[in-house]
Amino acid sequence: RRFTPGCEGVRLRNFGMAIGIRDTRKIDAAYNMTERDVREQGRFDDSIGIYPEFIDGYGILILPTTGRYMQIPYRCMLPKGVKNLLVAGRSIGGDRISHAATRNMACCAVAGQGAGIAAALSVKSGAMLDGVNMAAVQAELARQGVRYL
């Protein structure tokens, strides 16, 4: 306030409670999402949810106003070389531009719900996570009101 003319009466009302980092590490997954998946409404047999075409980063801004959407494949949460592990949230497998879409909190929630259901069904059935019954996962998603197609 002292050093900026015109700001003598300014007061701080609020500030971010935590530092956010937008771009972090991602897994090398059984399937890595691509820019094409995001831009061309990628469709997958193992879809666990949908997310609108929304890219915000790396000099690209596409706002989710078109009605276009991509499906999030279950395989993008299965890391290569590690058995019985799911990785949800902004660390799911994908290239740089797909990450600008999938790192958003709402998309992370979509992946998290799918991961939680898959994990529960894996434990219940005794199946490994890479062998979980996708029809059962999708049926439970539908029962919970999730749009995955």
Language model features with spans:
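Flavin (FAD/FMN)-binding glycine-rich loop and adjacent Rossmann-like elements that form
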Residues: R1-L149
